[in-house]
From Swiss-Prot:
Name of this chain's protein: Ribosomal RNA large subunit methyltransferase E
Location of the protein in the cell: Cytoplasm
Organism, as annotated: Methanococcus maripaludis (strain DSM 14266 / JCM 13030 / NBRC 101832 / S2 / LL)
Similarity section: Belongs to the class I-like SAM-binding methyltransferase superfamily. RNA methyltransferase RlmE family.
GO cellular component terms listed in the entry, alphabetical order: cytoplasm
PANTHER family recorded: PRE-RRNA 2'-O-RIBOSE RNA METHYLTRANSFERASE FTSJ3, RIBOSOMAL RNA METHYLTRANSFERASE
Principal cellular location given in the protein's record: cytoplasm
Enzyme class: transferase
HAMAP family: RNA_methyltr_E
Lineage, opening ranks: Archaea, Methanobacteriati, Methanobacteriota, Methanomada group, Methanococci
Presence of the UniProt keyword Methyltransferase in the record: yes
InterPro entries for this protein: RNA_methyltr_RlmE, RNA_MeTrfase_FtsJ_dom, rRNA-MeTfrase_E, SAM-dependent_MTases_sf
Superkingdom, taxonomy of origin: Archaea
Amino acid sequence: MGKKDKRWVLQRKNDHYYNLAKRRNYRSRATYKLFQLNEKFNLIKERNVVVDLGCAPGGWLQAARDIVGEDGFIVGIDLQTVKPLPHDNIIAIKGDMTKEEILKQAKDLLPEKPDVIICDASPNISGVWDVDHVRSLELTTMALMTATKMLKKGGNFVVKVFQGDLFEKYVQLVSEYFDKAFTTKPRASRDESAEVYVIGKRFNGKKFDMNSKSPIVKLLDTKPVEEEITSPSLRKEISKEDSGLMIKRIKEMRSKKE
């Protein structure tokens, strides 16, 4: 085991929320993030219907179930298979949350439109700040788009976002679809993490506008460019140049979209 691996194991052993989750049979320390977010913003209530986007490994499914109780209902969606949980009011679907057939499958399972949509999903991490920020925004914007397709009017939304240049513009975008938008970092988030949670309270019923002039929406059109600049061959070249080329290309991409 290398020094980095040993350091990671030691850090986890000393992690309060990791140990707490393990003792209480929660699948992830992130379970406590949702508990803390809900305590502060009253997002989920007893008997609510909840959809969890990017639900693997199931920590937020467990937290949501503890809050809604046996009379609530939760559907999770993830590209990975999620090990079943011992509750008949939790169902996890394997699939892409942006695909209409997967959304239809989720809607068909729900007893009614969801009261709350939650998303703690993370993109694949490259280790390059600008790239990870763009990937995070692409993922969270797709989550917002999905929320506007599914939420009942007056419903709530919470999503994890990585901080960066366009973070405030994402918050502004969320505020177009909800009466109030908030940002917060729960106690269970690690101090060194760039993650922040964006909360939308009381969905106004407006459908997602793909023709919006928001630079965040425009990012959804940049996937081919992003794939190009993060390809293994270019990453190898970039690592020799201290990642400068990658950062330059992403900034060029942003300026064109703005």
